[in-house]
């Protein structure tokens, strides 16, 4: 009998890449992947724990799966599974929970369970290589896992473990396999992507130089990189005519030096501003595309007064001027230094500040679009057919629509914005 399996992925693109890899491996073993809402014999839930809401969502989904599929096997992994393993094991219907360093055991454990065999508990690799597949244009390639930074608000280092990676020599074949599927764009992903090399004595700069040589891949994006790890040497090389696109996702978290210090971040606003300016100077030419900056910001960190928040607002509006702001209201996470502070910010204040930054983001994004009008760009068109239209993204991440043409799927075309 063919076993049906449903996959549920919560959280980041790294989780998405890992789930896609579990799916590929299980399909090779004869499983049939089905939408989880349709019911299945087995479920694999890949959880997130970045906020308290993420934890709650994970619990609710697990309970719903068991309620609707009381005979199904339910396996759980992901960041929430690492931090609260006993809590998840106590949920009715859960078959087994896998922590951050146990991901290589998941597929063998599922196979053993459905076949009635004994699970192999010998030591498994702590790094689980992964990349997403199934899309015809873009793949997320995991190059790094874990984080050695201990920012005062974050549980991810505890959920994902220490920074680790496999060698470049093992990553290149994965990129080549992605290219063999006809995929043109790879997004490099990790927990602290720029910290690549801790396990192997290599560097992220060495990695991207080798990936740039992979035939068949035309475009690369870096999903997120800490500002202190994005070096001028790296920027000089990226802007020298490589396959790496003018699209930078950089976590700022606060535009106030007081808050940055209390968060335990590794830079100040002056250093951040210099990095942004350097990238613009090295990338932008008159009449050419503008650089896309996506900036992460946390609002309502303990001790953030209205005046300190306005420092962030002003820094974003007048200095960084990103194309997009990823806004996160601070979430109190047990076990972190910030959670113990007495000067917590009220939720209603966080909501107001989120709205202010969302309004600013809308303005800045529109200005970014306007600044790129009339510019010649390359667009990688995707397969989605939406009311007779298809979409794609420029190198600097502007979404473009055109009449649907199946022959354009996965092709890079020149357009005038």
Where are these regions (language model features)?
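Short strand-connecting beta-turns/loops that link adjacent beta-strands
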Residues: 38-39, 148, 253-255, 385-387, ...
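Short acidic, glycine/proline-rich loop/turn micro-motifs
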Residues: 260-263, 337-341
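Proteins enriched for Cys/Gly/acidic motifs involved in redox and nucleic-acid/cofactor modification
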Residues: 1-195, 209, 233, 269-286, ...
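Conserved SAM/AdoMet-binding glycine-rich loop
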Residues: 74-75, 83, 180-306
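Residue-level signal for inorganic ion chemistry
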Residues: 44, 79, 106, 188, ...
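Glycine-centered loop/turn positions within well-structured domains
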Residues: 104, 149, 194, 228, ...
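Terminal RNA-binding accessory module
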Residues: 340-417
């Amino acid at each position: 009998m063919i076993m049906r399996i449903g996959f549920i992925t919560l959280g980041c693109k790294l989780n998405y890449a890992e789930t896609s890899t579990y799916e590929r491996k299980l399909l090779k073993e004869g499983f049939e992947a089905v939408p989880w809402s349709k019911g299945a014999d087995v479920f694999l839930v890949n959880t997130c724990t970045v906020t308290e809401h993420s934890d709650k969502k994970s619990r609710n989904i697990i309970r719903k799966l068991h309620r609707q599929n009381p005979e199904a096997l339910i396996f759980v992994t992901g960041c929430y599974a690492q931090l609260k393993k006993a809590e998840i094991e106590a949920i009715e219907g859960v078959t087994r929970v896998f922590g951050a360093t146990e991901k290589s055991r998941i597929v063998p454990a599922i196979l053993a369970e459905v076949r009635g065999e004994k699970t192999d508990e010998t030591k498994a690799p702590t790094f689980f290589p992964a990349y997403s597949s199934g899309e015809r244009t873009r793949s997320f390639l995991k190059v790094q896992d874990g984080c050695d930074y201990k920012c005062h608000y974050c549980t991810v280092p505890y959920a994902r473990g220490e920074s680790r990676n496999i060698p470049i020599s093992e990553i290149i074949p994965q990129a080549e396999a992605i290219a063999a599927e006809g995929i043109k764009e790879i997004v490099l992903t990790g927990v602290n992507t720029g910290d690549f090399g801790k396990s192997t004595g290599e560097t992220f700069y060495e990695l991207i130089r080798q990936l740039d040589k992979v035939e068949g891949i035309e475009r690369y994006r870096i999903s997120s990189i800490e500002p202190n790890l994005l070096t001028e040497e790296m920027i000089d090389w990226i802007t020298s005519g490589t396959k790496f696109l003018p699209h930078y996702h950089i976590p700022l978290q606060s535009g106030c030096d007081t808050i940055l210090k209390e968060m335990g971040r590794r830079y100040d606003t002056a250093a951040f501003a210099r990095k942004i300016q350097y990238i613009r100077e090295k990338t932008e030419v008159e009449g050419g595309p503008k650089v896309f900056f996506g900036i992460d910001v946390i609002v309502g960190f303990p001790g953030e007064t209205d005046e300190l928040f306005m420092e962030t607002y002003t820094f974003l509006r007048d200095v960084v001027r990103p194309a997009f702001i990823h806004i996160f209201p601070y979430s109190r996470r047990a076990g972190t230094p910030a959670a113990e502070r007495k000067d917590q910010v009220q939720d209603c204040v966080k909501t107001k500040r989120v709205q202010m930054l969302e309004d600013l983001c809308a303005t800045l994004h529109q200005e970014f679009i306007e600044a790129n009008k009339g510019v010649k760009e390359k667009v990688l068109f995707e397969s989605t057919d939406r009311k007779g239209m298809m979409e794609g993204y420029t190198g600097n991440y502007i979404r473009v629509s055109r009449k649907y043409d199946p022959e354009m799927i996965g092709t890079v075309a020149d357009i005038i914005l």
